[in-house]
Amino acid sequence: MLRGLRVVVSGIALAAFTLAGAVVASAQEPAKPVLTLDGDAAVITFLIKPDKTADFESVVAKLKEALGKSDKAERKSQLAGLKFFKSPQQVNNSAVYVLMVDPVVKDQEYDITRLIAEVFPVEVQEVFLKYKDSFAGRAITILNKVP
């Protein structure tokens, strides 16, 4: 009986040690970005369900607000390089929004919901659902300057 108890206690101690090590490792290494842009500039085309354009535009507004309120200088630089446009034309029965990024801030996160989560962690789930429900497609074009 005592031997079985030692095995259980040892197992719990090992699990706690492993978990503590994982927490320390994650605290030391910031999360790697899920979407970086590698060129000098980029054009991101979003296809949005036509009845969800107001929802998507509220996501864009929240993104701009998050970048503007961030304490990180890189986020301010990202905001300065973003320009959103809406096309009067539709593609595949979807509204077309174009995000021009010029210049790209190298090695930085460009995933919309992750950027919003940095500043608005409580609201991000609601924003994500609006984004997901409005989304019909996306294309990313990386651009490099021609000498």
For the regions a language model picked out, list residue spans one by one.
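Phenylalanine-focused residue identity feature
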Residues: 17, 46, 56, 84-85, ...
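Bacterial N-terminal signal peptides that target proteins for export
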Residues: 1-20
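N-terminal secretory signal peptides
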Residues: 29-81, 85-86, 142
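Divalent cation-coordinating acidic motifs and surrounding scaffolds
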Residues: 90
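Boundary at the C-terminal end of the N-terminal hydrophobic targeting segment
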Residues: 20-29
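Alpha-helical protein-protein interaction elements
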Residues: 9, 20, 47-48, 112, ...
